[in-house]
Every structure is written in structure tokens, then in C-alpha cells.
Design a protein with these regions (language model features):
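Beta-strand elements within well-structured catalytic alpha/beta cores of enzymes
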Residues: 18-20, 41
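Dinucleotide-binding Rossmann-like beta1-alpha1 core, especially the glycine-rich loop
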Residues: 58-147
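N-terminal Rossmann-fold NAD(P) dinucleotide-binding loop
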Residues: 26-27
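Helix-loop-beta segment of a Rossmann-like dinucleotide-binding subdomain
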Residues: 125-135, 145-174
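Glycine-rich Rossmann-fold phosphate-binding loop(s) that bind the pyrophosphate
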Residues: 22-23, 45
Length: 174
């Protein structure tokens, strides 16, 4: 409470927003509040990005798994935020990161996963901001094994390479 009182009394005025926790979400919330002209204080118990943010996967994903649940609004929002980070807010801290989806079922898997990733890419391209990452690509068994030689060739029919993004969140919050 002493820290919060000190943060609010520095200027002698009441705060519009007090954000507790200076991880990636808290810092982003404070930045958003300040950019809207609100008087804002950000307090952290330890160091910036030292809590949950320090133990995250660092992924900035577009919500691919939510396509299967037909939550298109959430996917659209996540893709727009990813594109905004990649192209406007922090292109120096956010970078595309490739993923390899191994295909093991002969008949249905490639068209099913491929259609989902095509929709994912299309939603990213028609969003408010640029996609920011390369489009997905279908690979043969040989192409997949070139990228990931430890995959079991006897179980593999091919793969699909797609992209999301990764952020240096400790630098993003400071």
C-alpha cells in the first residue's frame, strides 16, 4: 500500500489508472492507458517482467487452436495483435518463428490441417495489420526430414510448416 500511495501522490493528483504488476500484460495495459491520455502508475513487487512473463513460452500466437472451436472473433483479434506487434509496435523485438506439423495419417490429415492453416493465413492477411509472417507451406516426407531428421520416416507422410511469432517480452516491457 505504501508503494501505491507513493505512486499516486508523486504529482499530488489522483490517478486514473493504477496497474499492479509490470509483466507483459501489465506493461501493455499501462502503455494503452497512457496512450489514451490517462494518468497512470505502474507498480511491481520485484523487477519488470520477473514473474509470469519470465517463465512464458514467449509466443505471440494468432490463436490457431481456436479455429477448431470456430471462435473466429478471437482468432481475428489475436492475429491483428500479432500483426501489430510484428509490424508497428515492436518489429525489433518480435520475430516470426517456424513450426513443423508432422503428418502421419494418409487420407484426411493433410487436407484438414492444410485447410485450417489456409484459413489462418487468409484471416491474417485481411486483418487490420499485415500478416507479418510467411504463409504456411506443405512439405513432402523428404522435405520434412530435411528440416527434422529425427522424425520417424516410417510414420511420416509429410508435414506442414507454418509460422507464428516470438517476443523478447522482458525487453518489450522495459
Amino acid at each position: 500500500l505504501d508503494e501505491m500511495e507513493a505512486a499516486g501522490s508523486r504529482s499530488g493528483d489522483d490517478l486514473d489508472v493504477l496497474v499492479v504488476g509490470a509483466g507483459v500484460v501489465g506493461a501493455g495495459t499501462a502503455l494503452d492507458a497512457v496512450s489514451r491520455g490517462l494518468s497512470t502508475a505502474l507498480v511491481e513487487q520485484r523487477d519488470f517482467a520477473s514473474g509470469t512473463s519470465s517463465r512464458s513460452s514467449k509466443l505471440v500466437h494468432g490463436g490457431l487452436r481456436y479455429l477448431e472451436m470456430f471462435d473466429f472473433a478471437l482468432v481475428k483479434e489475436a492475429l491483428e495483435e500479432r500483426g501489430l506487434l510484428l509490424t508497428r509496435i515492436a518489429p525489433h523485438l518480435v520475430r516470426p518463428v517456424p513450426f513443423l506439423y508432422p503428418l502421419t495419417h494418409h487420407a484426411w490429415e493433410r487436407p484438414y490441417v492444410g485447410a485450417g492453416l489456409a484459413l489462418y493465413d487468409a484471416m491474417a492477411m485481411v486483418g487490420k495489420y499485415d500478416m507479418g509472417v510467411p504463409r504456411h507451406r506443405h512439405l513432402t516426407r523428404r522435405g520434412a526430414l530435411r528440416l527434422a531428421p529425427d522424425l520417424r520416416p516410417d510414420a511420416l507422410t509429410g508435414a506442414i510448416r507454418y509460422y507464428d511469432a516470438q517476443v523478447d517480452d522482458a525487453r518489450l516491457v522495459t
